[in-house]
Amino acid sequence: MIEVLLVTICFTVFPYQGSPIILESGNVNDYEVVYPQKVPALPKGGVQNPQPETKYEDTMQYEFHVNGEPVVLHLERNKGLFSEDYTETHYAPDGREITTSPPVQDHCYYHGYIQNEADSSAAISACDGLKGHFKHRGETYFIEPLKLSNSESHAIYKDEHVEKEDEIPKICGVTQTTSESDETIEKISQLTNTPEQDRYLQVKKYIELYVVVDNRMYRNYNSNRDAINERVYEMVNTLNVMYRPLNFFIALIGLEIWSNQDEINIEPEVAVTLRSFGEWRNTTLLPRKRNDNAQLLTGIDFNGATVGLAYVGTLCRPTQSVAVIQDHSKRTSMVASTMAHELGHNLGINHDSASCNCNAGPCIMSATISNQPLSEFSSCSVQEHQRYLLRVRPQCILNKPLRKDIVTPPVCGNYFVERGEECDCGSPQDCQSACCNATTCKLQHEAQCDSGECCEQCKFKKAGAECRAAKDDCDLPESCTGQSAKCPTDSFQRNGHPCQNNQGYCYNGKCLIMTNQCIALKGPGVNVSPDECFTLKQNDPECGFCRIENGTKIPCAEKDKMCGKLLCQEGNATCICFPTTDDPDYGMVEPGTKCGDGKVCINRQCVDVQTAY
């Protein structure tokens, strides 16, 4: 049974309007002073079970007033904030690398919401008082302790009451984005996904994030590693809240501080720094620490108003699943917003066009980074992101960490099967399972299972019972083994298997057809160009190359002309190609695509399908 500790906080509220006060987040002109007082309580019908001794509760509630109105803030510890193999790395004065695995299980970073408000969220650090933000009635409020001696006072304020550190608008360094026209966005919104595509989009996705802090930023915080750690934890906790609407969960797998010297050349020219960091990730970081994405936080002032840069549509790639972000604000929420923006580029999202908007406040993917933090994704961003996922299907985001890999003490009754548990159907009052003992989280006598595609009436289904049907020509059906409640791992047809009436060949579980690639890039009503276009554009410097080497575009050989730039036909425009971007694969024919009878594209060459794999 889950132990829930509800902590009621009585806040005495003193609206304050006078001279500004200096908080960690900057100068605040208007705020309310509150004094939290903890009152332990149990939920209605709750039973308190012995639990491992921890400093911070898994679940807490705070009651207080906002503008004279009582609210209840519900908080739950962000159990997915750290991965089990989370490490911290710094460097000794002699350059030695020092890597540790600190005990981060009992951390103090929470997500939450205001009770009885559907559109509410919160990200709070409870390490030393309450610090963070919550959304109430469409507006974002910040809370942080007032550093007064012998006082538990906190300040609650809104973003508009914080003095701006710099009036110059900040920008992202990504310039070669392909913003869609209003007409194209409207057409995309009318597309209907297949049931299989909808299932794929609804599956929870995970990014194991590695954060690097450069030497300048380290020195900016008085060479205090603890202060750096706390700042990064808050940022990643906030990043998680911003990505939940996209069904993404971000786990911090490593934090590295270049405490002795920078391990790469960090230049004011942001593109140079991004390239160097990507090469470092590929050659130095990945061989010693797995991760899905790495971000560099730097204390350098990039040229102009730029505060970040990332490659577009490159998640999971060794050299390009990276971003660089200037630590441009005292406020962690501001820098977290920039981290979210650059990660959005890695996830295939370009800058919003003028027709894109958000329900409240600025959009995360606006080309100009707002002075207001804690933005949200526009409908344009959501559509573009989904198109990227369906077109590329990056594999690293699907490897869900095992429950034992999520750092948290097991809690019986929270519906998650954690280490040492055989099942978890909630509290005894809520449990609806005949197979699971809600008090012990163990299976009932003679029960083999509680849930799963291959579990039926507490028993494993017989071997051979189909548990996952083939979704298309390139998929294979899966059957139960008779020994497990889980359906076996999804498998697919061999590469080169003909699909969709011989229009294409299977490649890594997908039937790759050029017309479908055109639709993914341009929307409905588009087809692949006729063969004559590929001949006509063969020597075109923008549309006729097969690869780029040291910045030089290499034309396709005659036999390989169907494996370079993708050409599409829309209306009277018959030979459309796509502009070159920071993503070298954008607008190129995908590997495994049919380029002739019995031929497929591999490494930008049109080769015999019988020998390609």
Swiss-Prot record:
InterPro entries: ADAM_Cys-rich (IPR006586), Disintegrin_CS (IPR018358), Disintegrin_dom (IPR001762), Disintegrin_dom_sf (IPR036436), MetalloPept_cat_dom_sf (IPR024079), Peptidase_M12B (IPR001590), Peptidase_M12B_N (IPR002870), Reprolysin_adamalysin (IPR034027). Glycans are attached at N282, N437, N550, N572. GO terms for molecular function: metal ion binding; metalloendopeptidase activity; toxin activity. It comes from the Eukaryota. CDD domains: ZnMc_adamalysin_II_like. A motif (D/ECD-tripeptide) lies at residues 473-475. Its main location: secreted. One of its GO terms (biological process) is proteolysis. Residues 205-401 form the Peptidase M12B domain. Snake venom zinc metalloproteinase that may impair hemostasis in the prey. Belongs to the venom metalloproteinase (M12B) family. P-III subfamily. Monomer. This is Zinc metalloproteinase-disintegrin-like MTP8.
